[in-house]
Amino acid sequence: MLCPSKIRHNGCPVTYALDSFGDRWSLLIIRDLLLRGFSTYGDFLDGGEGISTNILADRLKFLEANGILSKTPDPENRRRIIYALTEKGFDLAPVIFDLFLWSAQYDPETKAPKELVEKMAKDRESLLADIRPAGLGTK
């Protein structure tokens, strides 16, 4: 993974995006924060994707360094860290939605819930409002 100072600045928005969050594990972490309510290291580790501990730790650190997520100590258990999307991270929700919709359309074995696909396609603003973390501003 590229640290923020190593992101290629060739002016291409796609290159910037891919260098900022474009690998498989980073996108799945963002998905899980947005749609599955994950917030702890254990949530991601036990999420069913099979991510290894070293890759998970690396991606969480990378996403934090790039301003996509933040981490804070859990007030109920100071040894546990709570991860949350920043405004910059939440702004990736439409990207995740579009990947989700594209896959739901073209993957013959999709397990995407039909209700969620329909809401992403037809009522995106309502879905964004529903999943927006309480601490983030409104747009």
Language model segments and positions:
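A detector for short, charged/polar N-terminal pre-domain segments
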Residues: 1-9
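A conserved beta-turn-beta hairpin within the catalytic core of GNAT-like acetyltransferases
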Residues: 7, 39-40, 77
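N-terminal helix-turn-helix DNA-binding core of bacterial DNA-binding proteins
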Residues: 12-52
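Short, charged/polar surface micro-motifs in flexible loops or helix N-caps
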Residues: 35-39, 62, 89-90
